[in-house]
């Protein structure tokens, strides 16, 4: 079945036929080969009919087309993008008209001579992007008219100078190549193109050497084209290139390819550095080297039967006339059953290396630790260093090679850099000082190579000691610093590299080059090493004695003052005298000096035939660390056990002569520096044990020894020491601890006693001390942190000999100092908030916003958390910031700025901002109060004579006392006013800062300045402690009461508190009748306003329960009351009442009946009809006669009684009542023994001060529940409303209404007597009590019961009139 036929339009058929005819008519011979032929339509030739352009590009031709097939007039031939490999001789013969030949992008590698013959008209030839390696002048024969030649992109690396000799018309040439080497082989290029008409194209760039890479060749000069420098080959490869692991018997071929540099270039093979030759018996077949395209040379090596011996490095070596180079590959030949080396982790001074599980016979490589500044390769990349480790055939790790890796320790790496530096006379002193600066930290050396590198540098510097005398001083200091290195590290350095022997040799020969006729003496001092050298004449030698000594520490005769180097006192020194003297170390004649060793050389030291000049040198070492016990004693192996050097080591040596064998012995005395027993005399034999050195007992004899000094007699010149047996369990070496001045310890103890007195008192008597909850917390924490700071300072500031303890002391001091300042700041904020909430703006009627409750934990997070964070960060960054190389346990200087001084300054600044704000609030409040008093005085209300005012006590006898002016003072929940609290806190901060500064100066300074600041510290500490304990304990009445309450006989001896308790201060001047008629019922006298501003409750409680308690309001002897009132009125000035009672209760301002939680804004009316029910009573009424008699006394002594029913309008005019809330922060009202004595109402308030909200209820605290206001009588409620609307209004009408209400109340009450109306009102409101001790007659039942155990409540438990003295 055939598909549908597609019909081609007729006109399309005609067009195709015409096209084919046209092609066939132009070049019919090329139609079968796929080439195309077109006419040349260039303007230069107006007759294009005879000129042809043939294009055979991209036709996959493998050779050039036959010339006979091309048109005769072919002017352009395109053979690009084919696969032509060779141009034969005469390939284009006959194309005499050809002007352009394009042969680019082929595979041409060979051009035979005469390939372009006959192309006399050729102008452009493109041979780019082929594989031409050899170019000769014969290749371009016949191209006489060629103007443009492009041979770029081929594989040649250089060109023959005569290559373009046949091209006479050449104008432009390009021969860029990726292998083009711009060296001496192309030195002809600049002159050739400069002298001829040809031009080198800009595309011709250099590829090699690297210094000329990508630079245009035409811009280079002949001097740039040189063959100097290392040989760089554009090609050098070895296959296989990676490490090969093969088994025994395998076949392994190698193929090496290299650049053909010159005619003598050759390839050779090596195995493990040994030449390899062809040996068929061993399976080694080596082929001859072959050259390719005049560019490459190759060689092949075949291992037909690999043996185990073939393991190792196989290397292909390229030898040229300009040098040799090579590449290699590692071959590992394994047995058929191979083992493995286990995985292993190694930590050393080069870093941490993890060697993996490796097959036996394999070398494993690990990258070195990358440092901050890695080295760069010549190519610009990062040079990756490696460590190697071989796993032997038995499956065991060999020693690794870490030489290419850098040291991880900074000091070690720097010392290694010094080793690599060249030393000469110009830089020797500079390098020596730099090395010496790094040896200052020798105590922290942890590697033996540190000691080794310093020893090697000292040996290098010895070559320049003669011309640079300063070097000897630096070398002695280097050796002295190295004696601080740990004993074990020095011992290992001696065993491994004999580093200690090298150092000792350098020091003991240091003076020889510097002694001559013009410099006959040399002395060098340091802390641990001292050297003395002399040029002597043996013929005149009479003996010499040299003593090593040092200054006593802190000697009075020391000349070292502030600013001088204190280490000069501890330097070792020599004192030499001529003649032989038996100098005793204990009787050393220099004042304030300690002799450590002495050596006496006899007069017969030199033989008779000694040379005329001789050099004598003494060297003393403070200890024997440079002379470790690397092995047993020479000749006395049994004495080497558990022995150590217990004395300094002193050396005596000669240069240029020797000791006479018949000389008298040398006498050496040495002082013991460590305990031990069984001493032996020894000298150091540097030649023993293969020049490692050892102590020898031959030649020295111990002639005397005691606890402190040993004397030796030796017959050889050497290093001398005394060896003692070390105990089996030696005690830890005692580290000297610097002791502060005794006044610091004494006065710190006084300060701690005072502070802990405060802390213990406020903790044990928490519920008895009237202080806000926040103030209680801040006071205890401030005291505790001040105690911590002073105790840690006195006990640990000088413990620098114990690094860990010293760091802990520094951290604790840092924390406690900042925390103390923060707690003082928190206290300042608390006072400021309290002052802010008592400003007149809120007292005059602004509605107080109910604050939200906030926990006390925030204070601890600020005052304790912030210092903890600062200290933690400081210690985490570098724990050595505390007590590192400083004589006290504190922060080092530079980190202390950001970690302590700046935060401390900010804390003090913020604290003083709070202080200033508090002062501003208090000044504003005092100004408003003075204005209120002036307003009250400008509109007085006349009191009738029948109402002599009882001042603040007037309202105590009425139920509307919540709106009466009962000494409306501030209800600060502290005995001190805000002003006193603020001033005390300022003084505390100032004295603490002074205490801290004096302590710091006492530690920092020395001698007299230290004593001065120690005394200042003691005085400041004592003053701070006394001030705090006086202010917070002795001057507080509640603290006194709490202390006295601890005495067993205090309650039984305390007098009745209710006999004479004057109440409040009357504003203005009172008449005699008014003062004499005042009746004070169980209230306290007003005193100095700055002294008493107690609240009706304590805020230090944790309870949230509000219990209403009152003080005993019992009336006792009325006559006594009248007499006391008359006496008080006569003694006290107008407006002031003075207390005369000795009871503690009388010294506390209380408020007997005024509810402290009474709001004025919403006065509530409530009928007071509750009565106290019957209960157990201890006292009963004694009859109406006695009560009637008391009533007469009351009338006779009290005058009119209506004044007691209500205050005047003047007293009401300037009183502000603010609702008081109990909260979890400021404490709750509670029924406790401590509060029973003071009751719920405060009588001791200042005139004109409102019942301000405590700071605890401010923004820092919240209400836990509002108290319900006490109910008021109707007249009282109306009067309260009138007081809010008009402050300066007469209250006489209100007083009459209040009296009437009181009279009705008295009739209703259970008063035992039927008195007249004017007396009944007073008594019924004040003295009616129930058998259970509750006052009745007011709208609130007030509890007056108490026990003997109560501190402040010594009230009666019966009715008011019982148990009274009858007058």
UniProtKB/Swiss-Prot annotation:
Polar residues bias locations: 938-949, 1224-1241, 1344-1353
Record bears the keyword Lyase: no
Record site: Cleavage: 356-357
Region of interest: GPS: 681-730
Domain Ig-like stretches: 230-332
Domain GAIN-B, chain residue ranges per copy: 574-730
The LRR repeat ranges on this chain: 70-94, 95-118, 119-142, 144-166
Region (Disordered), start-end ranges: 938-958, 1126-1156, 1221-1271, 1339-1367
Record-level GO cellular component terms: plasma membrane; Wnt signalosome
MF GO annotations: G protein-coupled receptor activity
Keyword Magnesium in annotation: no
UniProtKB keywords: Angiogenesis, Cell membrane, Disulfide bond, G-protein coupled receptor, Glycoprotein, Immunoglobulin domain, Leucine-rich repeat, Membrane, Neurogenesis, Receptor, Repeat, Signal, Transducer, Transmembrane, Transmembrane helix, Wnt signaling pathway
Signal peptide: 1-26
Listed GO biological process terms: angiogenesis; canonical Wnt signaling pathway; nervous system development
Domain LRRCT: 178-228
PTM (free text): Proteolytically cleaved into two subunits, an extracellular subunit and a seven-transmembrane subunit.
Major subcellular location class: membrane
Membrane-topology annotation of the record: Multi-pass membrane protein
Disulfide feature: 256-316, 700-714
InterPro entries assigned to the protein according to its UniProt record, in alphabetical order: Adhesion_GPCR_A, Cys-rich_flank_reg_C, GAIN_B, GAIN_dom_sf, GPCR_2-like_7TM, GPCR_2_extracell_dom_sf, GPCR_2_extracellular_dom, GPCR_2_secretin-like
Family per record: Belongs to the G-protein coupled receptor 2 family. Adhesion G-protein coupled receptor (ADGR) subfamily.
Matching PANTHER family: ADHESION G PROTEIN-COUPLED RECEPTOR A2 (PTHR45930:SF1), G-PROTEIN COUPLED RECEPTOR 124-LIKE PROTEIN (PTHR45930)
Subunit structure as annotated in this protein's UniProt entry: Interacts with reck.
The protein's name: Adhesion G protein-coupled receptor A2
Phylogenetic lineage: Eukaryota, Metazoa, Chordata, Craniata, Vertebrata
Gene that specifies this protein: adgra2
